[in-house]
Curated annotation (Swiss-Prot):
It comes from Kluyveromyces marxianus (strain DMKU3-1042 / BCC 29191 / NBRC 104275) (Yeast). Forms a stable complex with ATG17 and ATG29. Interacts directly with ATG29. The ATG17-ATG29-ATG31 complex interacts with the ATG1-ATG13 complex. Note=The interaction with the ATG1-ATG13 complex is induced by starvation. Disruption phenotype: Mislocalizes ATG8 in the cytosol, when ATG11 is also deleted. Belongs to the ATG31 family. Gene3D superfamilies: 2.60.270.60. GO terms for biological process: autophagy; protein transport. It is found in: Preautophagosomal structure. InterPro entries: Atg31. GO terms for cellular component: phagophore assembly site. This is Autophagy-related protein 31. The gene is ATG31.
Amino acid sequence: MDTPMLLVTNVNDAIQNDDLRMDSLTNENAWFLNNISYIFEDDEPIQQEDHSNYENLFIIDSDLNGKISGVELLSEKWQLLSYDQNKPYNCISLRVMDELRADLSPQDGDVKDLDSLARRYHDRNVQIRNLLDSLIQED
């Protein structure tokens, strides 16, 4: 199996730009992961390198033909919402969320009027809906 390309979309950025498309490699809210180390569960010798500075760990379960059976993200900051495999491009698209950004607390200085507060509530609702949708898909 060739090493797949990982394409990540941060749902929070997509929400702010009203663009939640996951079907395009040209999505402006997507980025390609770099500085990737691959760890395989087989008899190949493991590269000697320092693994202590890794921030995120993706566990990708696949068969010998490259069909993905599951993806898991171990991270203190990010939550994996969903993934999709694009076989022709040998690409795995990941949909992640880093945090609920829409802070609705009254001490937040940039809520100046009712429209900006309504926009924050809307953003928070979209984020929560995405989280719930990802939980429903897992069942």
